[in-house]
Amino acid sequence: EGQPLESCVLEKDEDPQTLHLGAFFNSKLIGIISAMPNPCPDFTKHRSFQLRAMAVHPEYRGMKVASQLIQAVLNQVKEKSTVKTVWLNSRVLANPLYLKNGFEPIGTPFEIKPIGLHQRFIKQLHHEI
């Protein structure tokens, strides 16, 4: 929020393995999330996906839209049987959302300028046999 439109374009957006999901209400886009293959700096030996570009329209926050997007993207990533971990850098204000969705914090908070204080989170995927 509050960033220039160009900041919405991310490296690997066009990668064929990258996932872009949206949440809609009455045909209106109310939330987005992306997940892309990207090694986690803390678990470089595992094939990982990074969650990025999570956003929910302010009028729809607090309605579990973000959790539904996270679960939808996790379900799709789990289908890629070689992916072991999903990770992200969360704004610290959003930390409760990721804790609620089974992610674990790693390390200490760090600054991403000009956005603010962030915390890295990781979730180990358990593939059903």
Per-region residue spans from a language model:
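Active-site rim helix/loop that mediates acceptor-substrate recognition in acyltransferases
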Residues: E1-N26
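Short hydrophobic/aromatic beta-strand element in the GNAT-like acyltransferase core
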Residues: S7, T18-G22, I32, A53, ...
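Conserved beta-strand in the GNAT
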Residues: G22, K28-P39, Q50-A55
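A conserved beta-turn-beta hairpin within the catalytic core of GNAT-like acetyltransferases
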Residues: N38-M54, R61, K80-T82, I115-L117
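Conserved acetyl-CoA-binding loop-helix of GNAT-fold acetyltransferases
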Residues: V56, G62-N75
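Conserved GNAT acetyl-CoA-binding A-motif
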Residues: V77-S90
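Conserved catalytic-core motifs of GNAT/GCN5-like acyltransferases
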Residues: W87-N89, L99, E104-R120
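Generic C-terminal helix-cap and adjacent flexible tail
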Residues: L125-I129
